[in-house]
Amino acid sequence: MWTYPLTWGGIVGGDNAISPYMSYYSGTQYQLKFTNPIIMNGIVYFSLPANNAITGNGVTAVDLRTGKTLWTNPDIASVNFGQLYDFESPNQHGTTGIYLWVTGFAGVSIRGTGIVNPGADAVSALSGSYPVGTDLGAVPAVTSTTAVVSTTGWMAIDPQTGKLLFNETNVPFGTRAYGPQGEWLISNIGRANSTAPFTYLWQWNNTKLPGNDVPGGITQWIPGNTNWNMSTAYDWNVTLSQALYQTKTPIGAFGGFGLAAAYDPATGLYTNNPTIVRIFPGDKIYGQTSGMQQTPGTGAGYTGTPDPFTLWAINLNASRGQIGQVMWVKTYPAPANNITVCIGTGDANVATLYYKETMQWVGIDMLTGDKIWGPTATETPAWNFYTGTTGLTNPIGVGNGHLYVAGYGGVLRAYNLKTGHIDFTYGNDPNDPKNSTITPETAYGDYPTQVAAIADGKVYLVEEEHSLNAPAYHGAMTRCVNATDGTLLWQIYGISSWQEQAVADGYYVWFNCNDGRIYCIGPGPSATTATASPSVITKGDSVLITGTVTDQSPNTDLKGTACISDADQSLWMDYMVEKSVAAPMNAKGVEVTLDAVDPNGNFIHIDTVTSDMSGMFKKMFTPEVSGEYTIIATFAGSGSYGASYAETAIGVLEAPPATPPPQYPIPIDYTLPIVGTGIVLLIAIAIVGILLLRKRP
C-alpha cells in the first residue's frame, strides 16, 4: 500500500567500512526504530526515533490506507497503548472514550495556564516528553488535593490531534487487561502485612472517574480537561476463598515476570510471591508462585525448576461462582534431569508449559489445573533450543485454537491447544521453495523465524535473531501463512524484528531493517476500464472488447500499474517496490469477467479472461440480436486488491435487405425452332427414301 522512510537504510556506500557493502544499524535489539506501533480507527501511531535511539523526535499519526501523515507531536516521546471505551447509560450509548495513553510518570499536574509540569522527580521518567513550558492548550486548574501515593500516572492524548486531554493519577501497580467494554483494568493480589499470606484481590478501572455523574444520577462520559485522582477507582476488592502463600526455593532469580522477590544468602533460598501471569477479564486469573521464567524468557539465566512448582487460578465469572474464589492451587513435580520449566502462553481454556532443554510442551486445563497433554516430542533442529530464551525473541503465539511455535530452527509448528497434536508445520520442506527456510546464509542452516503477529486467520513470520548482523542475511523474508494449514499466502524480501509490527483492519504494518522503511501490506484499491471497438456494428459482425485492471494503491511505485495475481504478488512487490529482483516476465494478471445486457434485458455471460503484465485484457464478441448492448467488465477482487468494474456500450444494426439483381428483357432465341425444323425435314426425307426402296421390284 505505502512505505514510510523512518531512518537511514540500505547500503552505506564508500569504502571505509570493515565489511564491503555495509548496511546501516538496524536497531536490533536495544534501539528498535519502530517499537510499539498502535493501530486504531484506521490510523497507525508510532514514535519517531532519534539517531541511535528508540524515541526522540516525537509521535506521529499516519493514515493506515493512504500513508498520509495526519499529525506529529514532537513533545510526546511515545504512546503506550490505545483505548476505545464503549460507555453505556440511559443518556449515552456507543464508543466515546477514544484515547492514546502515555504512562509511567509521577504526580503530573495540569496548571491553569495550560502548561504541563511533571515536576523535578518525574522529568527523567517522562524522557522530556512534556517539558516545562510546553503549551498543550488551556485546561482548568487541579481540583484534587489528595497527595500522590502511587508512582505511576497516565496521560490521555487525543488520537485526532496529538494534544493532551486529561490525566489520571494514583494509578496502582498490577497486571493490566482490556475489559469487555474497552476499560483498562488493573488487578493484583494483596495481603495485610509483609509477613501475612495473600488474601485479597482487587480490580481497578480506568473509566471510574470520581464524581463523573451529572445531577440526577444519569451518567455521561465527559472527562473534561483535568487531573483525575484515581485512588478510589476500584470495581471491587474481594477476599480470596483461600489464601495464597509465598514459596521458598533454591532455584530462582531476581527480576520481572514473576521472578523472585528476595534472596537469603544465609539459607540460599529465593522467596517467591504469588504472581499473576495472565488475566482473562470476566473469566479467570492464572498465576504462579514459583518464580519461574516466562516464554518468551526473561533472560534470568538460571536452569532447573523449583520442585515442586505451584500454579493457581482465581474465578472472575460471577455466573460460575464467587469472584475471588480460588478455582485450584496445584503443585507439580519438576521434571527429572534438571529440566527448566517455563511458563508458556495459552488461552482461557489451556495454559502451556515449556521444557527448555528438551524443547517440549505441556498443556494444562485452566478449569482444573490438570495436565491434559504432553510432554510433546522434542523439537528439531537443535537450534530451536534458543526459542524464547530471551525476552527479545518472540517465536510463539496463540490463536485459532493453536499454539504457534517457531525459533532458530526455522520451522513453524502449530500445536493443537486441546490435544497437543501438531496440526501442521511450515518451513521444513527442502523440496518446496515456498515451504522452506533452509539457507547457507546463516550459521544455523536456516533463517531464524519468529512469530510476529496472528490475526484474521493468518500468522505473520519474520526472520531475524537477537542482535542482527550487518549486512543482514541475504534472502531473508517476511512471510504470511494460513493459520489453519500453513499454506504460504505471500512473502516479501525483508528482515524485521517481531517487536516492530502491527496488524489491524486487514493491513500489516512492519519495519524493514534492510532499507529503513515502514511497509503497509494489505488489499489495495483497483480500477477497471473497458472499451469496445467499433462501437456500432452490423448484426453478424464482431467487436473487440479491451480494457485494463490497474493498481490504485497510494504507493507511487504501484499506482497505475497492472494488478497481478496473488500467486505472483510476492515477486512482483519485490520488483516494483523494493527493486530487489528483475522483472518477473511470466507474471499473470487477474481474472476479469465479461458480461453483457442485450436490448431485451437479457444477461449474457461472454467469457472470463485474464489480464497481462501491463494490466490489459481483450476478447472478441459477436452479438446475436440488434439494438443497444451494455458490456460489463468485472474484477471481483483478490487477496491483494479490492474489486472494481467498468461498463461500455455498443450498438448493433439490422443488416439491410438484400438488393435484387436488375431485370433485363429476354431476347428471342430462334436457334431451337430452326434446329427443330431441320430435324423434321431430315426425318421426312428419310421416310420418303424408305418408301422408294420398298417400291423397287
Model-derived regions, located:
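Short tyrosine-centred short linear motifs in exposed loops/low-complexity segments
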Residues: 540, 615, 625-629
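Short, exposed coil/turn segments at beta-strand boundaries within extracellular/luminal domains
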Residues: 602-603, 639-645
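C-terminal membrane-anchoring or membrane-association module
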Residues: 684-697
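Secretory-pathway ectodomains
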Residues: 1-538, 543-572, 577-578, 585-596, ...
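Residue-level recognition of secondary-structure-to-loop junctions
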Residues: 611, 617-625, 635
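Juxtamembrane/start-of-transmembrane alpha-helix segments at the extracytoplasmic/lumenal side
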Residues: 665-679
